[in-house]
Amino acid sequence: MSLSYSNVLNINKKNYNGVTIEEKALSGKINIRGKSSDKEFMKNIGSVLNLVLPIEPNVRIFNNNISIMWLGPNEWLVETPENEKDEIISLLESKLNPEKTAITDVSFNKTVLRLEGEKVFILLSKFLVANLEKILETNFSVAQTIFIKIPILFIRNNTDKEEISLDLHLNRSHAKYVYDLLVDGSKNLNI
């Protein structure tokens, strides 16, 4: 029997004082751990994902359907279309040495909120000490931090010439709480 799951909030894209918020459609999320200094590991990952794992902090790389985020020196998050996740996990398991690596399906415990608009960083600054606008100034960069006592992965989706777009990867159990805070915080963005 296969488990199934759905979005947590089931909300459509809504605009709140210049910031749109939506819960992204479900996607596959695979946590990979291994040594970036292990050439065989890096080669095998590359052959399965058709991408080279980023080894620089706060970097995201992507191709058609797959996105890889650097989480730490020996840890990455791979985001895939939901319908391709199981096949990718199977291929990774067949190529990687299980004694030196770990592959974990984390799709069921994470959801993604997308924030877009010119006031996104103003809204987030109400809840963070860190200056996300500075931290995420590079196109398609990532940052992990604690957001109102909740660990969140922030991903910048836009280039300099595009509207600000951030994805917030967070635990499903915190989604409603964070969403309500963001909606409430958006009521006065004239800082």
What spans do the regions from the language model cover?
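Basic, glycine/lysine-rich polyanion-binding surfaces/domains
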Residues: M1-I191
